[in-house]
A protein has these predicted regions:
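Conserved Helicase C-terminal RecA-like lobe
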Residues: 27-28, 37-41, 45-67, 126, ...
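Walker B catalytic acidic pair
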Residues: 151-152
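Conserved pre-motif I regulatory segment
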Residues: 2-35
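Conserved helix/coil segment N-terminal to the catalytic DExD/H
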Residues: 100-118, 123-144
Length: 486
């Protein structure tokens, strides 16, 4: 490809060196992959690339597609933070069941606009006919002067899914295409095929998945009754595959980025199931009754109600008589996505014993028991020191430290981790500060990414906002402030 000079413009936020390197590599490419580990700022690189192409007169439309837990970040955080103020733009967020105001905003995409339009959709909607129809209409209407990007592109790794097929087809109508992910391979090198097909059909040199698989996977015929099938038992020619990917990608790990800030905070949004919504509303109304008629509410009463709401977000509820109801939660799926997207060791904090047990089981099932350790009240003293030693050993296979911040949040050194996930936060500010500092100690120059799982429209938002902004919740949840939260 002809290398066109990168247009210099006034960055709204100064890029780190690795971000500038990524922009230099990708700015003029028709298709490109940003393989940048979580916390290295790949969203900013894409935004700067969009602005560059707009400044050069190449595009006036961008379609950004991301998982439900991420696509809201683009609208509320990434675009406002990084898009230059001197560039005229509008952001339209797709909502599956919009209210009247949201519906007007979505329909406004048909209106003439002098600047650049950024349309943000969640990737899950492309599993539906409605989502595919909207995406196809946008592609036909704006694709010739547009760019399409999939954030966390491992969401389209399944070659057989309707979502993947729809997006691979849709991308053909766009002049520019991008994929963004921390790691294009979550389980198997076979994962990269459909992601690269989204960028450009046949870019790896194969007209179909089976030809690609035959080149890079070792296959054996298995018999099951009267039927037989071909099973992947290993991989081959991976150096060749990596060289092909290098032609249209930029890769960076957090450990290689020396100028990142010490602490990077990222929200990950999790929608509630129907059962969670029902129970949450029921308990919320019960809590509000406590405030009626000017009744004096004690701190323990208020904390109990808050805890019950938090339990619902984690997928269970303990009644006054001790009965525990368990139900589906998408929180564990969001955690799994993070674990697959991120390399290296991870700390996962939750205040609830139920969460710790469930997380440990799910991660063991997905990654192996030897990769997982629990550190909470049930953990014996001799096991505790062994867990710390294994986790701190960079050559150890222990990858996931799952703990209660009240038990493990003080005094321990867990500096091998570069990623921390808060599955269910404690209300106590000091507990949060102490737990953050387990993997980030004085004199250390590495960057740590802190990810809070947040269910939109719930007390999660209030809790995380307060803790990240160093507000002591233990004082604020008493009285009228708590009523506002509910």
């Amino acid at each position: 490809m002809e290398n066109k000079q990168l247009v210099k413009y006034n960055f709204k936020t100064k890029p780190f060196k690795h971000q500038m390197d990524a922009l230099d590599a990708s700015h003029d490419k028709k298709y490109f992959a940003l393989f940048m580990e979580m916390g290295t700022g790949k969203s900013k690189v894409l935004i700067d690339n969009i602005v560059h192409l707009y400044d050069r007169g190449e595009i006036n439309f961008a379609l950004i597609i991301a998982p439900k837990g991420v696509y809201r970040n683009w609208v509320e955080r990434e675009i406002p933070q990084h898009f230059p103020d001197d560039v005229q733009y509008r952001v339209i967020r797709w909502v599956s069941n919009p209210n009247k105001e949201q519906e007007r905003e979505i329909k406004s995409v048909k209106d003439t606009f002098e600047g650049i339009t950024i349309f943000v959709m969640n990737v899950e909607i492309f599993s539906t006919v409605k989502g595919r129809n909207v995406g196809n209409w946008l592609a036909k209407r704006f694709g010739s002067r547009g760019i399409v990007a999939v954030d966390e592109s491992t969401t389209i790794k399944n070659t057989k899914s309707n979502r993947t097929k729809a997006l691979v087809q849709l991308s053909k109508d766009f002049e520019y295409s991008r994929i963004l992910t921390g790691s294009p391979v979550t389980n198997s090198p076979m994962d990269v095929y459909s992601q690269t097909e989204f960028l450009k059909k046949g870019v790896l040199g194969y007209s179909n998945f089976y030809a690609f698989q035959a080149r890079y996977a070792n296959l054996q015929t298995r018999n099951m009754g009267s039927t037989s099938f071909r099973q992947v038992v290993g991989f081959k020619n991976l150096d060749e595959l990596n060289k092909k990917l290098d032609n249209f990608s930029f890769r960076v790990l957090k450990k290689d980025c020396l100028d990142l800030p010490n602490k990077v905070y990222m929200p990950r949004y999790v929608s509630l199931t129907k059962r969670q919504l029902e129970l949450y509303e029921q308990i919320r109304k019960e809590a509000l009754v406590l405030f009626e008629d000017g009744r004096l509410v004690s701190a323990p009463q208020m904390v109990t109600q808050m805890l019950r709401l938090q339990q619902i977000l984690s997928g269970y509820l303990t009644t006054d008589d001790g009965y525990q109801e368990n139900f589906e939660t998408r929180r564990i799926d969001a955690l799994l996505d993070i674990c697959y997207e991120t390399s290296g060791k991870i700390i996962i904090w939750s205040r609830f014993r139920y969460d710790i047990m469930k997380i440990a089981q799910v991660l063991s099932d997905n990654f192996g028991e030897n990769k997982v350790a629990k550190y909470f009240g049930d953990t014996k003293d001799d096991e505790r020191s062994e867990i710390i030693n294994r986790f701190q050993n960079p050559n150890s296979d222990l990858r996931f430290f799952i703990g209660n911040p009240s038990t493990a949040g003080r005094g321990l050194t867990l500096t091998e981790a570069r990623t921390v996930v808060y599955y269910a936060n404690d209300f106590n500010l000091d507990t949060r500060i102490q737990s953050e500092d387990r993997c980030h100690r004085i004199g250390q120059n590495k960057s740590v990414t802190y990810i809070d799982l947040i269910s939109e429209g719930t007390i999660d938002e209030k809790i995380v906002h307060s803790l990240v902004n160093k507000i002591d919740l233990s004082a604020k949840v008493l009285g009228e402030e708590a009523k506002e939260w509910l």
